[in-house]
């Protein structure tokens, strides 16, 4: 079935609402309206007004907890607790001990409250202190003592963290014996603290309200003595019961979908996938809805170039309808595709044509775009709220925010507000009570101070503000003009000279800096600059030192290793290439740069919008100042803009990669059961299958034959040693005659499987014809060793389970793929799918399962008892793994079956919205049950049942009396089908009927009417594509693992010699296929093959031709052919017009020189740690050794150098160059060994190798160990450390933070990452480990304490200097 297939013409169902959208939400069903109401959680009323009532106590507890959170604790509140309650609480101590196990302890609760932004519970209870200065000393900015000081608590203050729940502990409590009514009191407390008992209505008892009240006053509510009727064993069970949280780890609860969030998803009346993947606002305003539609349309049109101009308006209307279905009606993609198709096609009545507007892929794109929009929208609302709270008036903020269409633009606006109004934001934070004192200065303190000073007037005298210039850039024209000052820049700046700024140039420098910063933070400028860079940008790749060595000509990254100035826009056609480049950059193999193709031209264009047209000397001087400002802006933002572009492209291209994987899986799922050519089966009939395989194809492997019947169960099997034996062939033929399969499927895990196929065919030459096919075994390979196979067939051997999976794949590919669940991600859908995060990949794969599962439908009653069929239930529209499990359990609890679809509502198995989405995909066969509805066995939705009955009665030309009579006897539709009168449906003129429905009821139903006709003629007929038979290329790839395209002519491959004769040489390739080399292709000198080759030898050969079907290849070993193939590969490999040939040549020559240097006479040094290895070999040698181990090896720099390579950490090795002085000769070790520290500009001298090892290597290793055990060290990468700092800073906005991590690019170095405030960026300083010390910013520190303190002092000093500027 094609994804874009559209059956019939456009139509619709349901009246339009006030907004012009169809009110099609299932209200035409044959379900009782009373049963369509959503269940509401009732709140039972308890008439017991006793002061000790547990509900009152619970309310008190909740109030106490709320007060704890808010910090408003009354000192003497505990003294007001009645004495009776205290006594009861002492009695409850034993009962509460079990409940307390589920509660967080003090430290955990403290951490949770801090991380959720509620602050410490104890922070409000600290003793009063002297007021601090408004600005703390900079030395304390990263102080660890601050936290301890802030968490001090009055020693005499009672611990009130538990509120009333803690109670008062009697000092003599341990000495008081429990009285004999302890059990009774526990029972009393059980009823007090347990769930409220639902009240009984008087009318249900047949008495009046007054009588009920009188009875209640005399006898109570019946719970006072209920404990006496309680079974003690049951009570013990209750006391011993524990929550799931005490049984399972949180990760296990999440995997088993038993968390509270899972339960919410399970019971909420919304499709499960919408709750998981779609962030939306059902109650959004019409303005918000229109904004969302416009944003999605704009996004889609940027990527759709196949829409004609005349279809733009219908396309936009179709998108508007789809968004409405998602947001307002909670309809999933399969429902829209099946039952709202009329809204996503264009019906041209004049031309009588129907044009599809949206495909299933488009529907899923819109589905995910809804989430992206609401993420954008929520950020917009946050910005507008901040703007409103600040009480400022800025004509840029609101218009820019409303027009922003990307998260980048919103981030730009956020940066602009925090830069421009940083002081107001800090004042707002103070007023909101987020801190005890005025927050310290931010990174914008200098600009705040500058804007308040008179010097800011000089910035205004530049003649054009940052806003005006950015407006010109955004418009691409000079619409706002410069006004030159009558004084020259130097003359005007003299008036601002002070003691700190002693010259006009210093004054101008400060003014230029401020103006440049204002331009850089202007969101209009940022957006326009990024747009220019995207449209006129080029990409250049520079291989790192690691990349030069690692990326060889056969490496998958070589295609872009020397890429130079490739237009950025060209990657729209090669999105995967860009993703591969980003991945290579993450691995440290390349550096990716995005820059303007002609930066000078772009700069001139921007400058034209910023300068004056006047030609006076004064104007020229001011223009020169403006040019200096723009140079700084251009330089700074040229470095910042590429990051946003690459992340935007990464997100977009990952979506495209996800869609590629989805489409691949969709095509594999879209296969009907195999249709045997020798049988007259209806489409969709399940065949019986005989699966044959020899497993891995090794000589010891037997041939296994497993027969699987048409219900998917293995019923017979046969094991043969060798099918080449005629006796075994006869046994196989007898077995086939016995089980009589509809089709025989062969597969295996080696090339020998294709020979098994030939042997099977030979065995059946005298047998009546049976289809013989090769079967895709990608599912079977995973199934054979899975826990699912063990659970289903615990006694079957692995290879037999493999055969069962092969047979089932032939019977129904969908069921086999669906049964895999998330293991589907182990299959290959795209060579680069590993670039997708697992959750994102699964999200896209799931969409394919949902589409095909909903197309095929599910026999819901069969699914209750058949787990194999139930595997597709989670992928039915409206459901998911949680709701599917819930539905099966509810059906099992209500008799194990449902008689009709309406039972899903009437028996409260599912709620209304879920029912609307999934009901038509539930098949209920037309069995002989009185409550059966024959339409429940079709794809017709309940809302269209009346239309189906109307069409059936019109086809049979029945009057009302006839219809009434037939409806009392199974109905009109049943009569139409039983009497085989469905041919009369073709006589109906559906177009006229559809026009009438649209004209009178505003319902588009043309496609729906056609679908009803098809379903009445063939209920739930097979609509998938025919079973896909593997092509020779696909069989070749499956059995060899090699793509045939990679084994074409001129490919160079290693081959192993198996047989040598004077006429030919038989070889085998690594992939398992056989090769043949003619005698004249062995050498150019026509030397007989036996004189050159011997069995077992491995040589390089050139492929001449490949026979895919027979798994044979012809090769040549001639030197001339090898040289020609090498030359072709080098000239054609990855060459493009954007290739840096000079860099490639330079690196090649350097690598060759290093190779030659390594191949010189090997140097031998008498030392146990010396090895004759190169750099990569040394790393490989140390990879299996302990951290700190080392080797001494020769150096490529000459005989007066050696290299010490040592293992810094797992995967990290430092190569230390050692210069030898005072050598006796070329081969002896020098008497002086020097290690030059370039970074710290120090030279270390040693007398021999052992001294160097102990005093240098081991001393460094000891310091690295000291760093790694420090509490400020983090094991992750720099990016992970920075992310952690960001998260920590958000959770602790009043604190500065820092951490150390490995510098993976420079072994032997660490990176000090720090974040001074929540609004400041993360800054990184390099820290080098030197013998017995750490080196930071030109200073040497002996230990970690000194390093941390030194860092704080350095930062404080720099900040002070920065403020003076």
Curated annotation (Swiss-Prot):
The lineage's top-level taxon is Eukaryota
Keyword list (alphabetical) reads: Chromosome, Nucleus, Phosphoprotein, SH2 domain, Transcription
A Gene Ontology cellular-component term: pericentric heterochromatin
Q: Residue positions of the PTM Phosphoserine? A: 143, 454
The yes or no answer to whether the keyword Membrane is present is no
What would you give as a GO molecular function for this chain, any one?
Answer: H3-H4 histone complex chaperone activity
- Function of the molecule: Histone H3-H4 chaperone that plays a role in maintenance of chromatin structure during RNA polymerase II transcription elongation thereby repressing transcription initiation from cryptic promoters. Mediates the reassembly of nucleosomes onto the promoters of at least a selected set of genes during repression; the nucleosome reassembly is essential for transcriptional repression.
Q: Which InterPro entries match?
A: NA-bd_OB-fold (IPR012340), RNaseH-like_sf (IPR012337), RuvA_2-like (IPR010994), S1_domain (IPR003029), SH2_dom_sf (IPR036860), Spt6-like_S1 (IPR049540), Spt6_acidic_N_dom (IPR028083), Spt6_death-like (IPR042066)
Return the annotated region ranges for Disordered: 1-165, 181-202, 1124-1146
The residues covered by the S1 motif domain are 1050-1118
Pfam families attached to this UniProt entry: HHH_7 (PF14635), HTH_44 (PF14641), SH2_2 (PF14633), SPT6_acidic (PF14632), Spt6_S1 (PF21710), Tex_central_region (PF22706), YqgF (PF14639)
Composition bias, kind Low complexity: at what positions? 24-33
Q: Specify the protein name.
A: Transcription elongation factor spt6
Cellular localisation: Nucleus; Chromosome
Listed GO biological process terms:
nucleosome organization; transcription by RNA polymerase II; transcription elongation by RNA polymerase II; transcription elongation-coupled chromatin remodeling
Residues modified as Phosphothreonine are: 137
Spell out the family assignment given in the record's similarity comment. Answer: Belongs to the SPT6 family.
Q: What is its main location?
A: nucleus
Q: Where is the composition biased (Acidic residues)?
A: 47-64, 73-82, 102-111, 136-156
Q: Where is the composition biased (Polar residues)?
A: 1-14, 1124-1139
Q: Which organism is it from?
A: Schizosaccharomyces pombe (strain 972 / ATCC 24843)
Gene disruption phenotype = Loss of nucleosomes at actively transcribed genes. Abnormal heterochromatin formation; decreases histone H3 occupancy at the pericentromeric region. Decreases cell population growth.
Q: Where is the SH2 domain?
A: 1167-1262
